Amino acid sequence: MKEYGSIPRFFDDGTLRGEQVVAFNKLDGQNFRVKYTPKGATKKQFTMFGSRHQYVDENTEGFGDAVKYFKEHYEDVLREIIVNNSGKKGVFNGVEEITLFFEWYGDNSFAGFHQDGDTLRLALIDVFLKKKGYIEPNTFIDLFCKDDRVLTPEVIYIGKLDMDFVNSIVKNDWTKEGCQYPNIKEGVVIKRSTLMKGQRLPMCKVKTIWWLEQLHSRFPKEMWDKLE
């Protein structure tokens, strides 16, 4: 099962500047992944669960509830979407393995840490097809974001990536009345609108000053790079 890679910061990697992109609200939680097997002995089954780097199950501390949440809310829904789009011209046609990536988060989660008593939920953030790469953003939007049964990050921007948009995110403070993006706390994940050669889908992230200041006030300096 594929692991979700680290997303570079825009100010460290400006590859996408000037490209046609789609930007999604960056939800603040923990990465969770699920493997789906379309063929073979485990045909049309979700066969494996994991955090970013480890396999988990319903008894795993911290992620057992995420597995249970997935089975209750998403197992049938996502299987239906995949099966319905596995025909001759479907995006999942001929794919031997699918990894679905989620964010496990609550309203008060911060830097991947959850607040006791908070209600946690899973939002689908990416889908990877073995040997084909990530699903392109517009396909992701059509298949999942437009389906009310699937929680996904809000689409914030579609267009050419320029500094006006980047700076609008950096300066956004959701705690202030009249801010441009009241739902954005941490920042955005920006994805190229189409795959490049080699099934590559470049991505980058932009964080808000508000979030970075909160990080620096809550955690020791030696943790900043890891959590940013």
Q: How would you describe each model-predicted region?
A:
Residues 1-228:
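Core nucleotide-handling region used for phosphoryl-transfer chemistry
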